[in-house]
Amino acid sequence: MDENKKRALAAALSQIEKQFGKGSVMRMGDRVIEAVEVIPTGSLMLDIALGTGGLPKGRVVEIYGPESSGKTTLTLQAIAQCQKLGGTAAFIDAEHALDPVYAAKLGVNVDDLLLSQPDTGEQALEIADMLVRSSSVDIVVIDSVAALTPKAEIEGEMGDQLPGLQARLMSQALRKLTGNIKRSNTLVVFINQLRMKIGVMMPGQSPEVTTGGNALKFYASVRLDIRRIGAIKKGDEIIGNQTKIKVVKNKLAPPFKQVVTEILYGEGISREGELIDMGVEAKLVEKAGAWYSYGDERIGQGKDNARTYLRDNPQVAVRLEAELREKFQPAEAPREAGDDEEKE
């Protein structure tokens, strides 16, 4: 660059800093790129699939799937992990359906959890924005986008047609929220539901669509698709769901990874079940017929007994988890990958 251009650029940068503050514009080479801060999800498999060890702070995350697939369970376990690390968590319950007894079973300290049950979508998003701007909350969960009902719809008649109202509300809120989320380093998780598109579909195109328009798809750094794929039985009794979680979008690591984990009723994601499955995959746990062995010790006949053994011997589970993390998890979080999408 010639001297005249350099002087003009220096003058422009100086003017920008005077008007908007130091750091408004910077050279990428001058900025130290730090590893992304994360909040673990409570699922070792998912933490590894995300590539960064958890859900990234200072970002928007969307978790969507069919009913009873484990969306709220996953977010409550992330809240429990955040609280264990000394963080503050908020849950905006637009569905008015949070069960504090179940949350406590998943490890959430319900006495310290900030809970809001707003009347309208505008109120819910305004509360979320105020909590984010306080810079004192580590994770804010909004359950769910479908329940963020615009004020005009609540005040109107039952049959009123108000097309695009919720999509406009989400688009406006996310434009306002994203800058504050980055500055305050808060993780904001939106839980979303699925609907079916009505009309003729192109071959190979999915008829499923998430609620609340397209804005959230663009603003989210991570999108997780969670689905129940089978039942876990103990004899004839169903004790949980086999669940597939797919990383549909990831701006911080390679996307499209998927994991199959177990969600047990009243317990949440089975940590011991994940350790056994990953141990077998990594050849740290040996499976001979129905028997599972770790090291020189047999830990159980059948997965259920092996799971019980690890639960009763936490020191063995901790040792196995440490070995698995060393084998599967990258030494450091990767730098942020480029993103081709443009925000609308």
UniProtKB/Swiss-Prot annotation:
It comes from Xanthomonas oryzae pv. oryzae (strain KACC10331 / KXO85). One of its GO terms (cellular component) is cytosol. Belongs to the RecA family. It is found in: Cytoplasm. ATP binds at residues 65-72. Keywords: ATP-binding, Cytoplasm, DNA damage, DNA recombination, DNA repair, DNA-binding, Nucleotide-binding, SOS response. One of its GO terms (biological process) is SOS response. This is Protein RecA. Pfam families: RecA, RecA_C. The keyword Nucleotide-binding applies. The gene is recA. The lineage of its organism: Bacteria, Pseudomonadati, Pseudomonadota, Gammaproteobacteria, Lysobacterales. NCBIfam families: tigrfam_recA. SUPFAM superfamilies: P-loop containing nucleoside triphosphate hydrolases (SSF52540), RecA protein, C-terminal domain (SSF54752).
